[in-house]
């Protein structure tokens, strides 16, 4: 059985086209959300995320985004880019503030972020951390998370 979320007649490409038309212009509009501001600081070298032996850059990331470590929830749902790593024995932790969500899966080198932007609404990011180096890359999603997706049951 196929279940379409969004319009079943629109492909992802067509849907992304509509997101890039006025007034949204998703791809052309520079985000002003807390994650975008952090992204610019990281890219310019103005800021480097500290690493923790147990949790990597997560504590530093939460601190920079003003997301309290105490405000978290563990979820077992597979609504993640990392569905193959989430299980009842390895849940995803969601850290929340009023404007930012950070998803952390133990054993993964990817953190998933969502931020509330005043002009764009929800903006999605991934932070991929290279465990062998001090490198990390914070990337804004180009819109694929916003396009209709097809689920197969």
Where are these regions (language model features)?
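Sequence context surrounding c-type heme c attachment/ligation sites in exported
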Residues: 104-153
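Bacterial N-terminal signal peptides
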Residues: 1-4
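Short alpha-helical segments and helix-capping/turn motifs at coil-helix boundaries
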Residues: 56-61, 95-100, 130-134
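Sequence-level detector for tyrosine residue identity
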Residues: 18, 26, 95, 101-104, ...
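N-terminal low-complexity, intrinsically disordered segments
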Residues: 82-105, 114
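Conserved small-residue
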Residues: 10-81, 91-93
């Amino acid at each position: 059985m196929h279940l379409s979320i969004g319009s079943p007649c629109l492909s992802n490409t067509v849907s992304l086209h509509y997101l890039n038309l006025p007034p949204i212009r998703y791809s052309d509009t520079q985000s002003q959300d807390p994650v975008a501001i952090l992204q610019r600081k990281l890219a310019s070298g103005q800021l480097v995320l500290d690493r923790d032996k147990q949790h990597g850059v997560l504590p530093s990331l939460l601190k920079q985004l003003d997301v309290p470590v105490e405000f978290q929830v563990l979820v077992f749902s597979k609504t993640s880019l990392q569905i193959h790593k989430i299980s009842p024995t390895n849940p995803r932790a969601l850290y929340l503030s009023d404007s930012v969500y950070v998803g952390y899966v133990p054993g993964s080198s990817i953190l998933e972020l969502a931020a509330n932007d005043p002009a764009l609404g929800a903006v999605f990011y991934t932070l991929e951390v290279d465990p062998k180096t001090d490198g990390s890359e914070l990337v804004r999603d180009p819109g694929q998370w916003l396009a209709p997706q097809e689920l197969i049951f």
